[in-house]
Amino acid sequence: MVFATINRSATKTVPATIPAIEEAFAAEPSLKKRVYDAIENTPQYVPLFEDIARYTSSLLARPTNPPAQPAEASEGPAAKKRKLQNGTAAANAQSPADVKAETSLQFYMQDVSFAMPQRKKLTLEITAGRGFLRARNQTSKEVEFGVPMDRIRHVLCLPVPEKAQRQFNFCVIPQYSDGINPPTEGEEVFESMVWTISDGPAKAAFSGTGQQIGNKEGETAESLVRRILNENLSHIKVVRPDEREFVSAMPEAHRKGEKAYHVKAFRGSKEGYLFFLSTGVFFGFKKPLVFFAFENIVSISYTSVLQRTFNLNIAVRSHNGAEDETQEFELSMIDQADYAGIDAYIKKHGLQDASLAEARRAKRYNINGAKAEEDTTNNAEGAAAEEESELQKAQRELEDQEDEDEEDYDPGSDGESEGSGSSSEDDDEDDEDDEEDDDNEGDEDLVAAELGSEAEDVPQDEL
């Protein structure tokens, strides 16, 4: 027993103080002592206690929203009142200077390829105390850009289309950066972020203390980053494509046998990809990104329906926009092969019906696209099933027109016209000549009947 105790004491390498624990429990010395006592008895759980401490620090650092107070009557002009309110909001908002402040980290990953807002390799960081997601220059060690975690509205993890090697794009969309909702006056706007993670194990991912993580069996870099983000996003979750929502009729071009979740489309002359997700429709990956959240969509309709392609017209309204203030986005040159899947997605969420827009705005789909209430979904599906979609009508009319053209089509005779059939004008002239001949024959018969036997003495050409 004595030898075991001495041996255990000799192998201890726990530092006297741990920064994450010191920061988290600075105001609770008795609790901090209990944590250190537990670490002394079970040193193998140091990483666990550090994670708990960092999470506690992040909770303490998050600003608490005070309960809404009734607005007081103001004798001043309404414009002046709005200006004062906006100034207060801007003062309470976190600034870019806060994003770049030096603070302890919870997680960082080196050599991450960013595509937005800058195209370069940077270190991805998540801070412990202040709750920021940010990117640091690996040469200068300066923070290039970032966003407070509580200002993030959507995080998407999407497979990169048309790549031989499997990769994932993480798209972080802060408040007012979705391409639809403009910022209020004086509000700080943080840029959207896009970075790429290759499929496979994480090679340079670390905890805040510098311990390498992500090397567990079966854990990939994508699943690690997604897990870390979900642990730090209290109000939303990372959204991935789901074949129950939409899957393309065409498989991945460069990875045979793998399902594709994107649809190629154009916005103006800019080519991009559409993803139909559980929380909305995303168009990327080039600036500017656009995310059509369900609560912003008024309706979706089809335009420019052709044999091989069609367009989607998405009407949206911003959160602070008036009821009649809508803007439209046209996504063009979508392959007809994906019509059925897109149409099913639109009907499932009732996006073809503008009368359901207010219900979508009121609901806001709790936990970033958790299940909608079944009654609303079933009603939307039932209403959609009774209606023939605009695209189906257009397709039916196009087919009817083609059938009529085929019935009227005359391939012509193999005469001396260099192999071409007769035109419709020639057909009309031939019909007129035939009618004139019939009329003349009828007149001759009538004259002969009137003259009777005397007609024999009349020359044939005078009848």
Swiss-Prot record:
Disulfide bonds: none
GO cellular component, as recorded: chromosome; nucleus
Sequence segments annotated as region (Disordered): 60-97, 368-463
InterPro entries found in the cross-reference section: PH-like_dom_sf (IPR011993), RTT106/SPT16-like_middle_dom (IPR013719), RTT106/SSRP1_HistChap/FACT (IPR050454)
Biased composition (Polar residues): 85-95
PANTHER family found in the cross-reference section: FACT COMPLEX SUBUNIT SSRP1, HISTONE CHAPERONE RTT106
Protein name per UniProt: Histone chaperone rtt106
